[in-house]
Design a protein with these regions (language model features):
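Beta-propeller domains
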Residues: 73-117, 148-173, 226-230
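Surface loop/turn motifs at the tips and blade-to-blade linkers of beta-strand repeat domains
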Residues: 92-95, 128, 170-174, 236-244, ...
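Extracellular/periplasmic metallocenter environments
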Residues: 559, 621-662
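N-terminal edge beta-strand
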Residues: 562-592
């Protein structure tokens, strides 16, 4: 009977969804099953609600066709979210310790976090994640790696999507913060980290009165070794820039491959000081009518780096600004003031820029940019950088509304731009080769869809690749206000799923998703079938750090042992449902303890935990995983260790004693 009611309900929803308009549910006498009609009437559901329910519903046991990776903002993490169900699948620990995964509480993850510490060794244990970027092959997501930046501390993270774990953190030695990162070149040759606020290189002290002379911008091209799954600083380089505040970036592809584009603001070179009677930064950095779109020939920069025409600074190669100008690496063109988004179209023909204080988006033609560069004779800015006149680089402008920011694309020749002040998603028609894909005239606003509220970033299904999928856009709204139950003054963010499957003005909001543990910025949506994660680690004894069998792994509980060598005690422990071997470990106060764990399980989802009371140690051991912790037994007493992951009916019995003699 229950199955029949569910079937009738779904059929009823389909019938209702086929209707047009935003009308209340029909009464029971329409022929619908009474249960279905009653449910809809009781809940006050409309036909649009029924349509949205069908578009987002994933039956139990089924999986989403897409996965979205969203930054966690000042939470320092990454969220993996199913689309269209909008279900959180995983929180990935990145720059901040995360106890559920045992990230940062012993084991190899401690070493990963230490890799992102300050050059003097000072620990950094939180981050402000902003822009995740998936690895690409030929401008398409390949599902192998994910990169993300830490704006607060100018760091880059590498996440291996075989196990959804962070493998490397890299601290930028010459920038103190960043924003335009992480962005990849079309074959992930480089992961680009753009700067944000100008500072002396290496963040050395210099008075703000010396701003124009001693402060600089800096963009970093981190070389990525795909085989090792690591950034290689020795093969990476940086380009010195004027002290404008560089912002978001995007790599050229297709016809513009080999080039790179970044926004900037504060071409006024404002230094603030409202307490001194100076204009505040928000006024001082917005006086000019335009700022500068930065245009990089990164292929040429790579040649200059390989030729050795660089300076070494704090362990990394730097192409000085004078060299970048002389070698034809760096160019500018005016862009709308206070821009926030430089987004390359799928074929690389155009770059779209939204200026927060201009109701238009400005579309730049790469063909025109290249022609202006090749033609020469360009005037320069105050630092000698060639500036392409706007009329020599611009293809079109489209008036969209207030506060345009970021732009993504679909498979129908449309662009989608977030409008922060209007709280709307703007759909507009592209020109050029894209005009044949949609029925509208090129470069026209098609629809403005209200969203709730103050949308910042926007993402679409594979929407910044060489071949976007269409179907869905997600509005990453900064304010939720009244959309969810009141949980106190700190409110969740609101991700809204938008249906873009139909042409014209048929966009619809399908779903509101509260994000109550993060303040996400950018996100990317990948086809789920491009991801090939492990179900269990390939072999018993697998080290997630090296992605190989650990030399200290054991393959059977009979190999478990405790060995003392002077004041060093080394433990090889087997972990399996529902016990540890050994269950007693006894040491002396002051001993140095090295403890190896191997989860012997080969069953999917048979994860075990290890929590050692009093010593701030907490591990998550996935099936087949080996981990090692190392610490000094500096507290005498009786301490328990137990499995934190509910693994079996006798989960509570999976414990042991760590005895430390005075």
């Amino acid at each position: 009977m229950k199955k029949n009611v569910l079937t009738y309900t779904v059929v009823a929803l389909i019938i209702l969804a086929a209707c047009q308009g935003n009308q209340p549910a029909p009464p029971a006498n329409t022929g619908l099953p009474a249960d279905a009609a009653a449910i809809m009437a009781e809940r006050g559901l409309t036909q649009d609600d029924a349509y949205a329910a069908l578009k987002t519903y994933i039956p139990s046991g089924k999986t989403d066709p897409y996965i979205m990776f969203a930054s966690g903002g000042q939470g320092g993490q990454v969220l993996a979210i199913g689309v269209p169900s909008m279900r959180i699948l995983k929180l990935i620990g990145v720059f901040t310790p995360e106890p559920w995964q045992g990230y940062g509480y012993g084991g190899s993850s401690d070493e990963t976090l230490q890799g992102g510490d300050m050059p003097d060794g000072s620990p950094l244990r939180w981050g402000d994640t902003h822009h995740p970027n998936l690895s690409e092959t030929n401008g398409e997501y390949d599902g192998q790696f994910l990169f993300i930046n830490d704006k607060a501390n100018a760091r880059l993270a590498v996440i291996d999507l075989r196990d959804f774990e962070t493998k490397q953190l890299v601290k930028n030695p010459n920038s103190i913060n960043d924003h335009g990162g992480a962005f990849v070149t079309p074959n992930t040759e480089y992961v680009i980290e753009g700067p944000q606020y100008a500072a002396p290189l290496g963040w050395e002290y210099a008075a703000l009165e010396e701003y124009q002379d001693k402060y600089r911008g800096l963009i970093t091209f981190w070389k990525f070794d795909r085989t090792k799954g690591r950034v290689d600083p020795a093969q990476s380089f940086q380009i010195e820039l004027p002290p404008y505040w560089q912002d978001l970036c995007d790599a050229g592809k297709g016809v513009s491959e080999g080039w790179f584009f970044c926004n900037s603001f504060n071409t006024e070179l404002a230094t603030g000081g409202v307490e001194l009677g100076n204009p505040p930064f928000e006024a001082g950095t917005t006086k000019n009518d335009t700022d500068y779109l930065h245009i990089f020939n990164w292929k040429k920069a790579e040649e200059v780096f390989k030729a050795g025409n660089v300076e070494q600074m704090n362990g990394i190669a730097v192409i000085r600004m004078e060299t970048a100008i002389k070698e034809g690496i760096l160019f500018f063109t005016p862009e709308p003031k206070s821009p926030h988004g430089a987004d390359v179209t799928p074929g690389g023909e155009f770059i779209v820029v939204g200026g927060k204080l201009d109701p238009h988006v400005t579309i730049y033609s790469f063909e025109k940019i290249k022609a202006a560069i090749d033609g020469g004779g360009l005037e320069t800015d105050g630092y000698g950088v060639p500036v392409i006149p706007l009329d020599k680089s611009m293809e079109a402008q489209v008036e969209l509304g207030l506060g345009p920011l970021h732009t993504v694309y679909d498979d129908k020749g449309y662009a989608y731009t977030s409008l922060f002040l209007d709280s709307a998603v703007a759909r507009w028609s592209l020109g050029g080769a894209y005009a044949k894909l949609h029925p509208e005239d090129p470069w026209k606003l098609v629809q403005k869809l209200p969203v709730q509220y103050n949308i910042g970033h926007i993402t679409a299904a594979e929407g910044d690749t060489a071949s976007p999928d269409g179907g869905y856009v997600v509005a990453l709204n900064k304010w939720s206000i009244d959309r969810f139950a009141n949980v106190g003054p700190l409110l969740p963010q609101n991700f809204q799923l938008v249906d873009i499957s139909k042409t014209g003005d048929q966009m619809k909001v399908l779903y509101d998703m509260p994000i109550g543990m993060a303040e996400p910025h950018y996100a990317q949506i990948i086809k789920a079938d491009k991801l090939k994660p492990f179900e269990v680690y390939p072999e018993v004894g697998w080290n997630p750090e090296t992605m190989s069998v650990d030399p200290n792994a054991i393959t059977d509980a009979s190999q478990a042992k405790v060995v003392r060598d002077g004041n060093k005690v080394e433990v090889w422990m087997a972990v399996v449902r529902s016990h540890y071997t050994p269950e007693r470990v006894e040491v002396n106060k002051g001993d140095h303890v090295i403890w190896h764990f191997t989860n012997l399980e080969r069953t999917r989802d048979a994860t075990h935990g290890f929590a050692l009371a009093g010593y701030n140690i907490n591990l998550s051991l996935e099936p087949g995983e080996t981990q090692t912790i190392e610490f000094d037994a500096n507290k005498s007493g009786t301490f328990t260790y137990y499995c934190t992951e509910f693994c079996s009916a006798l989960h509570l019995e999976m414990i042991g004693y760590f005895l430390v003699k005075p």
